[in-house]
């Protein structure tokens, strides 16, 4: 199975998340405030919400992008109903539901030789994707030393790679959104991070939504 087939299968596997949103939307006064990471807001989330938004004319939806720490704080303050992140959260009243495993990919404008062994990535060209779950997943396979170019969002890493400034690792959705297929390569052995749905444990959802979360 190719990387792109894997990404498409994840879209198809997110039926439970669509069901949750659809049941929230059945309320005639339905309002959903969804927060997500910036990279997901540019790639995965628009794909997810478009269909059910169009099918539910009563739905009022607000979308916001923040880093995970801010999303958790907004959940605590009840400023958002749900959040999508690429890491589980164990904090206070926050419940985490694993939605899918998202492949990580090697991105490089100048590489053309198929799958990449993470140990063979050129440290001198490495663009650090920042201190978050993606970097933690990478660190389980290889510890990259301090680099000249460090970014705080996956999307920014793809922009620098597009300009030939170096190489990095990112999630398949951010890569597909911003880069040509020939710049995106599998990693061996494969690495994945978790796409997670966060919500407050003390906020009730519809019966069907509650069944999904349980």
Residues of each region from the PLM?
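Alpha-helical "hinge/linker" immediately C-terminal to small N-terminal DNA-binding modules
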Residues: 1-23
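Hydrophobic hinge/microswitch elements
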Residues: 67-72, 76-80, 86, 132-185
């Amino acid at each position: 199975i190719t990387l792109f087939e894997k990404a498409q299968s994840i879209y198809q596997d997110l039926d439970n998340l669509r069901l949750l949103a659809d049941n929230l939307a059945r309320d005639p006064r339905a309002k959903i405030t969804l927060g997500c990471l910036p990279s997901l807001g540019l790639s995965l989330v628009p794909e997810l919400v478009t269909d059910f938004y169009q099918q539910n004319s009563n739905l009022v939806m607000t979308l916001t992008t923040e880093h995970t720490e801010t999303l958790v704080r907004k959940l605590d303050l009840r400023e958002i109903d749900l959040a999508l992140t690429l890491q589980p959260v164990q904090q206070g009243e926050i419940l985490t539901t694993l939605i899918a495993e998202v492949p990580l990919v090697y991105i490089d404008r100048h590489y053309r030789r198929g799958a990449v062994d993470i140990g063979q990535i050129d440290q001198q060209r490495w663009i650090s994707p920042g201190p978050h779950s993606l970097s933690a997943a990478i660190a389980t396979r290889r510890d990259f030393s301090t680099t000249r170019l460090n970014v705080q969002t996956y999307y920014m890493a793809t922009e620098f790679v597009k300009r030939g400034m170096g190489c990095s690792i990112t999630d398949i959705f951010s890569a597909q959104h911003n880069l040509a297929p020939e710049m995106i390569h599998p990693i061996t052995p494969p690495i994945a991070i978790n796409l997670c749905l966060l919500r407050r444990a003390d906020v009730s959802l519809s019966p069907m939504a509650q069944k999904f979360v349980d």
